């Protein structure tokens, strides 16, 4: 019995990859899951304010993991999981590799976004030399304080929610969701997901993005 459903945001709850437009059918499916007793949690590289607002307005009860695992919200309390990245280091990274900072960086503390999203070996070396983590979601580069990655945040959320791995479902589209999938008992990759994610998923869905969310929730509720 699945008690908690973890869902990514961009490319998963949206109408497609590469758009910010949320799929209305997917949102209705999340509400059906909640009404059936499955708590829904948002797990994303997005900033805490964005996810907290969505969590509230969509009527979700499972909490959230923001900034790629660096912040967790559950039961009205927010927890920091990752180390803080100094603002001057963020600016140095952008300048060194000629990157554009995300508009959300103003509201971030431990995980910062940049475009273009292409990850290069010299970026990884630069981050490692400073005790940081850098990864690409396919939408943006993310520079994070350690431990970085969705896995640490999801583990904290499951602990707070008192939910076991086998009682947890997860759905996503990006290689950055692999860590989240490792913490869930049943996992689903939408049809337009990264190949790396499909290889580790329990289920490869027939439908893309938001339509895939509807497909997966139908499976869970059947």
Swiss-Prot record:
<dbReference type="GO" id="GO:0005829">
    <property type="term" value="C:cytosol"/>
</dbReference>
<comment type="function">
    <text>Catalyzes the dephosphorylation of 2-phosphoglycolate.</text>
</comment>
<keyword id="KW-0378">Hydrolase</keyword>
<keyword id="KW-0460">Magnesium</keyword>
<dbReference type="InterPro" id="IPR006379">
    <property type="entry name" value="HAD-SF_hydro_IIB"/>
</dbReference>
<keyword id="KW-0119">Carbohydrate metabolism</keyword>
<feature type="binding site">
    <location>
        <position position="10"/>
    </location>
    <ligand>
        <name>Mg(2+)</name>
    </ligand>
</feature>
<comment type="similarity">
    <text>Belongs to the archaeal SPP-like hydrolase family.</text>
</comment>
<dbReference type="Pfam" id="PF08282">
    <property type="entry name" value="Hydrolase_3"/>
</dbReference>
<keyword id="KW-0479">Metal-binding</keyword>
<feature type="binding site">
    <location>
        <position position="173"/>
    </location>
    <ligand>
        <name>Mg(2+)</name>
    </ligand>
</feature>
<feature type="binding site">
    <location>
        <position position="150"/>
    </location>
    <ligand>
        <name>substrate</name>
    </ligand>
</feature>
<dbReference type="InterPro" id="IPR006382">
    <property type="entry name" value="PGPase"/>
</dbReference>
<protein>
    <recommendedName>
        <fullName>Phosphoglycolate phosphatase</fullName>
        <ecNumber>3.1.3.18</ecNumber>
    </recommendedName>
</protein>
<feature type="active site" description="Nucleophile">
    <location>
        <position position="8"/>
    </location>
</feature>
<feature type="binding site">
    <location>
        <position position="8"/>
    </location>
    <ligand>
        <name>Mg(2+)</name>
    </ligand>
</feature>
<dbReference type="GO" id="GO:0008967">
    <property type="term" value="F:phosphoglycolate phosphatase activity"/>
</dbReference>
<dbReference type="GO" id="GO:0000287">
    <property type="term" value="F:magnesium ion binding"/>
</dbReference>
<feature type="binding site">
    <location>
        <position position="177"/>
    </location>
    <ligand>
        <name>Mg(2+)</name>
    </ligand>
</feature>
<dbReference type="InterPro" id="IPR023214">
    <property type="entry name" value="HAD_sf"/>
</dbReference>
<dbReference type="InterPro" id="IPR036412">
    <property type="entry name" value="HAD-like_sf"/>
</dbReference>
